[in-house]
């Protein structure tokens, strides 16, 4: 049943994509291949986009992957685990229908800041107890926070490279993001079983705080961010 449902979703996606007209790829710059990757990565906007994308994704994956083990330790049934993860996934992807509009209206940095606050709220709720409703609300907020941070960091990074530099810049950004995600996957099970759910969440406040600090730092450097992004 589950595989048939996935096949149906895949077919629906193909049908939707068949009616989308994608813009033609811009021509390469005539004056060469653009700046070296090191120069692109040294830009404050790129550094903040990479840091927020990596830390936001890492925290989300760390807590999400640890949640089933933590709920099992709390003797909650598998049906509750499934419900929590379902709402977490809804929180991750449902905002995608309007996150772009929010960024256009309010700016990318404020939306990313809301993502940081949602992650912090998730941790506070998770630290308040281990009942079903606390897991449910915390993981839903974590999903929405991830959406705002990941979409925002991707949008922010678009300002840091030209079409000729796109492949290298996006490759570097994805490396930072998904290397951090992989590390968090390896660490989550070990940390939740050896340190516990409460300490895992308390420790997650550190990367959340670093993400917020990076946004504040960039905000204090308005010359590094175009006006429409503030």
Task: Give the role of each language-model region.
Residues 94-108, 192:
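Helix-to-loop junctions at the C-terminal end of transmembrane segments
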Residues 22-49:
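Juxtamembrane intracellular "pre-TM" segments in multi-pass secondary transporters
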Residues 110-124, 205:
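Structural signature of the two symmetry-related core transmembrane helices
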Residues 164-195:
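A late C-terminal transmembrane helix in Major Facilitator Superfamily
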Residues 148-161:
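Intracellular juxtamembrane helix-capping segments at the cytosolic ends
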Residues 1-8, 190-208:
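A membrane-interface helix-boundary motif in multi-pass transporters
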Residues 5-27, 214-219:
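C-terminal membrane-cytosol helix-exit motif in multi-pass small-molecule transporters
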Residues 42-60, 140:
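Pair of pore-lining "gating" transmembrane helices in MFS-fold secondary transporters
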């Amino acid at each position: 049943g589950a595989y048939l449902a996935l096949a149906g979703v895949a077919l629906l996606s193909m049908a939707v994509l068949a009616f989308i007209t994608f813009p033609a790829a811009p021509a390469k710059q005539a004056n060469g291949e653009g700046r070296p990757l090191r120069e692109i990565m040294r830009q404050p906007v790129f550094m903040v986009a990479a840091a927020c994308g990596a830390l936001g994704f890492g925290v989300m994956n760390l807590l999400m992957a640890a949640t089933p083990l933590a709920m099992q330790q709390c003797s909650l049934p598998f049906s509750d685990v499934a419900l929590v993860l379902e709402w977490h996934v809804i929180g991750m992807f449902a905002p995608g229908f309007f996150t772009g509009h929010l960024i256009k209206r309010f700016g990318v940095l404020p939306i990313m800041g809301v993502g940081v606050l949602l992650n912090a709220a998730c941790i506070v709720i998770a630290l308040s107890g281990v009942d079903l409703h606390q897991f449910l609300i915390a993981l839903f907020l974590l999903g929405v926070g991830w959406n705002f941070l990941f979409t925002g960091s991707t949008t922010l990074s678009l300002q840091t490279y030209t079409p000729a530099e796109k492949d290298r810049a996006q490759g570097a950004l994805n490396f930072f993001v998904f290397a951090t995600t992989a590390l968090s996957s390896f660490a989550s099970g070990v940390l939740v079983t050896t340190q516990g759910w409460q300490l895992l969440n308390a420790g997650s406040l550190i990367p959340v705080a670093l993400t917020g600090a990076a946004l504040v730092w960039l905000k204090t450097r308005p010359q590094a961010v175009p006006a429409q992004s503030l």
